[in-house]
Design a protein with these regions (language model features):
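Short loop->beta-strand "edge-of-pocket" segments that line small-molecule binding or catalytic clefts
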Residues: 70-74, 171-188
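Ligand-binding "clamshell"
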Residues: 86, 140-154, 195-200, 238-241
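Ligand-binding cleft/hinge of the Venus flytrap
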Residues: 99-109, 186-209, 240
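Extracytoplasmic small-molecule ligand-binding "clamshell" domains
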Residues: 32-132
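A ligand-binding cleft/hinge motif common to bilobed small-molecule-binding domains
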Residues: 136-143, 191-192, 221-241
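Acidic, polar ligand-binding/catalytic clefts
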Residues: 111-171
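Bacterial lipoprotein signal-peptidase II cleavage site
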Residues: 5, 18-34
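Bacterial N-terminal signal peptides that target proteins for export
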Residues: 1-9
Length: 241
């Protein structure tokens, strides 16, 4: 789960990959103004040596013990947190590794990570999935529905097409077209910004929601959207590719 802090935007950074980080409303800018990508360096971790903790193992529900695995639900389109390997079927990423590590501490064989549209994950907890580690931001509304635990602190960043051809200004988003993933913190955040625009008598943000973040990146790079808004490690990883 992610904990987010609102901060100030950073400056434009160009990349060779078709899109560029344009701002980061949730983290302070780095010294050179670029989005931090150090978090994207290690995409997998060998959890096989992790041992069960007896005190925790004793608390595991019998139904999960019987299954022998922890069922994790995730939107597997959010690299480097969760995405498919080149075979197109094997999930990987730091959220996937975390689920497997937790399972081993619980005395299980490991975790399985199954894809689900992000907005459907929380309603599926307790029935289809035992747990979800899928880039969630902890919010008061979500805590009314499920128990949430923070294990990583990230920011949120805008990204634009290389060279910022539409002159997107992250400090003035009124009247722009922004792609965001359904059900995310970023969807709520850009909606808040859009409402602020209309309250000031300016044009609303044209919000373009999608189930997959990867679909949004393609549209930003091709010029269909002015920008996208996503977790900063996701923006950083996309730029590196």
């Amino acid at each position: 789960m992610n904990t987010k802090l609102i901060a100030i935007p950073s400056i434009l950074v160009l990349s060779a990959a078709g899109i560029a980080a344009c701002s980061n409303p949730d983290e302070k800018p780095s010294a050179d103004g670029s989005a931090s990508t150090s978090q994207t360096a290690n995409l997998s971790f060998d959890t096989s040596s992790i041992q069960a903790v007896p005190e925790i193992e004793a608390l595991v529900p019998e139904s999960i013990k019987k299954a022998g695995v922890l069922k994790n639900g995730a939107s597997i389109d959010y690299a480097p947190a969760e995405f498919f390997k080149s075979d197109g079927t094997t999930p990987t990423g730091y959220d996937v590794n975390m689920a497997d590590a937790i399972a081993r501490v619980m005395g299980l064989k490991g975790a399985t990570t199954e894809h689900a549209e992000f907005a459907t994950i929380i309603p599926s907890l307790g029935s289809k999935f035992d747990i979800s580690i899928s880039g969630f931001t902890i919010t008061a509304d979500r805590e009314k529905e499920v128990n949430m635990v923070s294990f990583i602190e990230t920011g949120t960043a805008f990204a634009v097409a290389k060279g910022n051809p539409k002159n997107f200004d992250p400090t003035h988003v009124c009247g722009t077209t922004v792609g965001v993933q359904n059900g995310t913190f970023q969807f709520d955040y850009i909606t808040q910004l859009s409402n602020d625009c209309t309250a000031k008598g300016e044009k609303a943000v044209k919000i373009m929601p999608h189930d997959l973040q990867t679909d949004i990146a393609v549209r930003v790079a091709s010029g269909q959207y002015d920008a996208t808004l996503a977790d900063s490690p996701v923006i950083g990883y996309t730029i590196e590719q």
